[in-house]
Amino acid sequence: MRSGGATTGRRGKWGLPALAGGLTLLAALSAGCAGSEPQLPRLSDLNPFAEKEVPLPGKRIPVALTEGHAGLDVAPADQPIVLPPPQANDAWTQPGGTPYNSSGHVALGSSLRQIWSADAGTGSSSYGKLTASPIVSDGRVYVLDTRGRVTSFSQSGSTVWRVSVTPPSEKDQNGYGGGLAADGGRIFVATGFGWVIALDGQSGKKLWEKNLMSPIRSSPTAADGRVFVVSADGIARALSVSDGSELWTHQGLIEKASLLTNASPAVAGDVVVMPYPSGEVVALRIADGQPAWTESLARTRVASSLGSMTDAARPVVEGGAVFAVGHSGRMVATTVRDGQRLWSLSVPGIQAPAVAGNNVFVVDTGGQLMAITRADGKVAWTTRLPGSTTWSGPVLAGSRLWLTSNKGQLVGADASTGKVDVQLKLSGPSYIAPIVAGGRLYVLTDTARLLAFQ
């Protein structure tokens, strides 16, 4: 496959490139590829879509066959990419946009320019990586830096307030990881110090705090009167949004070494889907924390210690199905209700997919962006993203898929063909997916610069 080209094809088999570098590890490991896995039978019981969908213009080109991972089925070349109409959104209250980690197709202008840049605190250093996604709630943008400081920004980029959530007995450089979620006018902060803290969104005043006694490297999700979070010891918890009291816990498998990723739970009806560093994806009943079903993203065959890393990306719930991908090379779609597997692909990834209409868009660990047919898991097109193999995203906005890279790039790819038709230079590298709210796209760079585009 030619570098930077978008390709599609006839029915057949094709492979993905080998895993590439650029990932921050908690242990020094060597790179490798996962083994092959057959695709499971297709099921067609996904929920129908209420909104009218319009095929996007653009010519699709055949998917080329590449060496590397196991073959994947290819969708018919004459099958159009269809998207639901873009919807205006004024908030991005969770790391995944919504409590179910699916933002759909959001509205965004066709021509972007940077309108402001702001200092959001301390970025990555030798102590730890900046991994927490910004959020937008009630007209404010909120950022958590690597020193345990939360900053609230106005729509013009000015600082409204900044508070430290570092415990008095801790050094602030140990506060990396964690994340933010908003609900009911409150900002919920999960920290690398092991605390979950509720702040008033308007003033930054601390409302309550809860010590989980274990670092939190992933982001929380707030919904249905609860804050859901997974700590580094593999324990999932549900806390009350009113006072932080513990409602239930669930112990997942413990993984001694993992990638420094930042996933978050997905709420879907009466269950919450928890991603664990072990590669487990477990649906727990919101009422009592009892497991409803379990899926594993871990591969049975691996070629190296890096390939054995099983971290799960942020699961996405859309239309009665859960879409999840793991670093070790497995991507699955299952039903929310009972965890029945719809399809499975050999795709390694640590970035949450974007789901809209009958399309699932995902970038793998080698920098290959692809469109997958939601109903049956067939590949519609693939694109080798330019200049880097380490990408964060995608988010679907204004009919484009937006991603950032470790080389300081912001790119937009046409969702109908995969062609990259927008490339912007950032002030620094970014390892966090863009977010979109109020017709603006926000990027947080690795040096903790918050950039706004409109």
Positions of PLM-derived features:
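Sec-dependent bacterial lipoprotein signal peptides
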Residues: M1-C33
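Bacterial Sec signal peptide processing site at the extreme N-terminus
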Residues: L29-P62, T66-G68
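Extracytoplasmic beta-rich repeat domains
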Residues: E37, W116-I135, R162-A181, W208-A223, ...
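Blade/loop signatures of beta-propeller domains
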Residues: V54-L72, Q79-I115
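Structural signature of WD-repeat beta-propellers
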Residues: D145, T191, S231-A232, Y276-P277, ...
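WD40 beta-propeller blade core
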Residues: T151, I197, R237, V282, ...
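Short loop/turn segments that connect beta-strands within beta-propeller blades
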Residues: S154-S158, D200-S203, S240-G244, I286-G289, ...
